[in-house]
From Swiss-Prot:
Belongs to the peptidase M20B family. Its main location: cytoplasm. One of its GO terms (molecular function) is zinc ion binding. This is Peptidase T. GO terms for biological process: peptide catabolic process; proteolysis. It comes from the Bacteria. Binds 2 Zn(2+) ions per subunit. The lineage of its organism: Bacteria, Fusobacteriati, Fusobacteriota, Fusobacteriia, Fusobacteriales. The gene is pepT. PANTHER family: PEPTIDASE T (PTHR42994:SF1). Zn(2+) 2 binds at residues 145, 180, 384. Cleaves the N-terminal amino acid of tripeptides. PROSITE patterns: ARGE_DAPE_CPG2_1, ARGE_DAPE_CPG2_2.
Amino acid sequence: MDSKKYSTLKERFLRYVKFNTRSDDASETIPSTPSQMEFAKMLKKELEELGLSNIFINKACFVNATLPSNIDKKVATVGFIAHMDTADFNAEGISPQIVENYDGKDIVLNKEQNIVLKVEEFPNLKNYISKTLITTDGTTLLGADDKSGIVEIIEAVKYLKEHPEIKHGDIKIAFGPDEEIGRGADYFDVKEFAADYAYTMDGGPIGELEYESFNAAQAKFKIKGVSVHPGTAKGKMINASLIASEIIEMFPKDEVPEKTEGYEGFYFLDEMKSNCEEGEVVYIIRDHDKAKFLAKKEFVKELVEKVNKKYGREVVKLELKDEYYNMGEIIKDHMYVVDIAKQAMENLGIKPLIKAIRGGTDGSKISFMGLPTPNIFAGGENFHGKYEFVALESMEKATDVIVEIVKLNAER
């Protein structure tokens, strides 16, 4: 099934996801992978073909464009943002599969490798009976996070351009790199974007509307041991691997991702590597509540002090850095931005699902740059892996929401 209202939506999505735009946390370049710049150049060309204005790629690989106002009064400028990169999972040779009129049963993604999208494991599938699903072939992610957001924004401005009877102010759009590795928005230029408020199209199922995110930090423990021949090690050896395990044991056992939900924060053991002489343990710290976030950071500082005191020397050094903050701190003073999106959904018969993100978006950083930017659903499910899928109808609804926000903005 193709979209009747947005005739190029499905084709555009299927084409875009085949671009491998996986970002690379180990890279120090901007963007982190060359393929993102290639994709940006392709997007720029297609936006030019649509006849948008002020189209450019800035030095940080953000594709910017404007759909100029067609109204004779001053209205606010609204922006829509999505990211080009995909998560740290195989994205080479993405081969999307289309499941028409989904029957509610298990979906075989890859017969040869016996990879099955099972309803028992993913009961969210039951929400999509009779819909058109786009899945992976079981060997890659899909990239609906966030190619669906890009497609929805482009299809919305295309629709508005084709329907000049819909009055609107200036509409700004931007597609950026490296969201998945938490760096892209560091280089977002709010002044250059020139919107009064914006939305990221980077959420999950229909109805999601998010204006609160985690506060986030990374704690890196660098451990220095003393390596001595095991046969003569008594009183001399300090085993960095054992210190690494001590550090891990000191963390609270229930404040972990797999045991928390809602507004509960956590410590997540992200990485560890060690031998006798040296080691490194990396945790990420997350909490919506600022006071609890600060307390968690204080906990890791005290942990290091305790370990060093035990060994009578500095065996552990801590590198603690903040990554992003809860955008709700900013958006709470601009709740009209949330109210407009909520009203747009209700006008379309969509029930808004307002909840705090257990993560972050580009909007987490952009909001603190002075541009309030909540997050709206883009339709995908099971992000960052081979079981990712999106319903065509969900992407249509997200596109409808963009158009409706634009209408409401012009009426304010």
